[in-house]
Amino acid sequence: MYVPMKAVNAKEGTITFDDEDGTEMTLPLTGGNVKLQWKPDFGARWAALDVDFEMYGKDHSTNTPIYDSICRILGSRPPEHFTYELFLDQDGHKISKSSGNGLTIDEWLTYASAESLSYFMYLKPKTAKRMYFDVIPKAVDEYHQQLRAYETQDDKGKLNNPVWHIHGGDVPKSDMVVPFSMLLNLASVSSAEDKSQLWGFIQRYAPDATPEGNPGMDAAAEHAVRYYNDFVKPAKVFRAPSELEREALEDLRDQLKTWDGGLDAEALQTMVFAVGKERFDPLRDWFTALYEVLLGASQGPRFGGFIALYGVDETVALIDDALAGKLTTA
């Protein structure tokens, strides 16, 4: 209710006004009896609670001088301010409840950890960021990269690392032996419906890893299966290889058939690189072909690492299926 004040008794801490039906009312200001308009509420709250730091979105920035003035009038010093930019949708539009174009916290947590969300929100607060489902895998992998980097940093580096602030200085170790983006690719080629399918690949690549000993990895495997089925699977589009791509894929397959280098991801990557370098300029066209023909995606992981995780024999079979046209009709 917005009504004019008939009387203000500063000594007694009361106000007098006419109610909606014309009845004169006198109420104490305390005890939750009254509420300020939102603009003066900022400055009054700062003064009453001795606030020394306030973060808020840029939509409040134009009113900051008003908030500060009210705080000073009430005899207090305004706090230090930090204004952050707003989140945008994938098309660069402002997120709003009415348009339903937002990504909610619950939706993020369906596919990734709370820490990955904290990491995403921490980065570049003064830059407007697009927040939609496709940014989740990158945020997860970058968060774990920072966890691993933290272990080798000096004190200054640790203080500048986002994970120090996310965890309040008590930073855990990453137990992700496989990147989240790689888990998504594994889920894709194996059509995984359950995280146990992914653990078969994970434990071949990292035999000491277990769901019990690597709870973060286990949660990520479950998130990856869920994310794959909800977002990747409906959008997968395989294409047939060109003649040049077919020749390169046959060469890669034949070299893999005689491969005796174990599951060394770097050695496998070197071989994949060499096959492409003989035929493609620019070389990225080769890797794009691998992703589009074998994974049904426009981008993907370091392919040597993928082979090491998925398996050499399995990759040979995958290439054979692609060359036979089985993937484009799947």
Cite the ranges covered by each PLM segment.
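Active-site cores that bind ATP or allylic diphosphates and position pyrophosphate for catalysis
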Residues: M1-T83, L88-S99, I105
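An acidic intrinsically disordered interaction segment
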Residues: T26-G32, L147-G157, E250-D264
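Glycine- and acidic
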Residues: W46-M55, L88, S99-L103, R253-L256, ...
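Generic amphipathic alpha-helical segments used as scaffolds and interaction surfaces in large
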Residues: E54-K58, S99, D170-S174, V189, ...
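Catalytic adenosine-cofactor/nucleotide-binding cores of aminoacyl-tRNA synthetases and other
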Residues: D59, T64, Y84-R226, L295-T329
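Short polybasic/polar patches that bind polyanions
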Residues: R72, T110, K277
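Aromatic-anchored, charged helix-turn/loop surface patch used as a conserved interaction hotspot
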Residues: T210-L263
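C-terminal accessory/binding modules appended to enzymatic or scaffolding proteins
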Residues: A240-L295
